[in-house]
Amino acid sequence: MLNIRTLIRPAAALLLAASAACAMAAGQTLAVSIIGPGGHSNGNYGHVNAVHAAARSIMLIEKSVPDAVVTAVTGGNSVNSIAAYANFRVLLEGDDAALKAKADKVKAAVEEGCKAENAFRGVKTGEVRDGLAADIRWTIK
């Protein structure tokens, strides 16, 4: 006679092992927002550009975290304006320690990309022009 317990135990063990293997890999999504003063390309020529800062940041992310996936890139609102904002998401995978290390690298890349855009336009951190913050600022959530 067939014992149901002898069938259930191996199946349960296999299911448990598969679940444990899946639980080892984790994912994290970072939402990056970059803002600057923006402006019209004629009257505000030379202002920092949030889309340019995002592009610089994404290129640096690609170098420092090659397996990261950058998605949902948005920014600017017109062909003749200097973008005041840019947003993108970074998808990371790995265990907890790897995620922390990758998130730190993404943060460093975004900081470096934004600093590069500020430096390219000769803007110092905290500088004010025409009553507005003149530099690129960023957040990661």
Which residues does each predicted region cover?
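Bacterial N-terminal signal peptides that target proteins for export
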Residues: 2-12
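Metal-dependent amide/peptide-bond hydrolase catalytic core
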Residues: 24-141
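Bacterial N-terminal signal peptides
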Residues: 11-21
